[in-house]
Amino acid sequence: MMVCGLGLAIQSCNDGKTYAELKEEERDAIQRFIELNEIKVIDEEQFEAQDSTTNVSANEYVLFDESGIYMQVIERGNGEALEDGRHEMLVRYLEKQIGEDGTTDTLSLNTIPNMFAHPDEFILTKQENSLSASFAASGAMYQAHSSTYVPSGWLLPLNYLRVGREISGRSKIKLILPHSQG
């Protein structure tokens, strides 16, 4: 009786897609999104040669090969590069999911001032090249995901931005994140 039950459980697990197949579908969906939106992908070497900026008018995004993150720097900011230590960060965001056909659906946002008077806040700790952060348990990201976890894909850009407090000097980016980074 026990062997039969185990056999049925193993057999039923084969009906779904493997993790590798799901990752491949995600890569394909991201590629379709890039094609649909006529995004020009540059490598990290070119990004660094351009002083860690992207050409927004050419719709450039840099691909960070190790993480699979794509980033477009719209406004780098006029603050300073982050020093080691603890930093209070304020963020407004629009989170979308890329579907199999490369189109998007909005999942979460805090960009509408009359709905979200305050940006989300997270506390960032930087120690040498290591970044970690957690959201305050009161913002839109916490409400959407019931977690204070700041996605690792949100941290990578902080190595290239000049974060400041003035609205006129804000940093603004667009990211395309694989599920493992977002």
Task: Locate the predicted segments by residue.
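C-terminal motif of bacterial Sec signal peptides marking the signal peptidase cleavage site
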Residues: 8-12
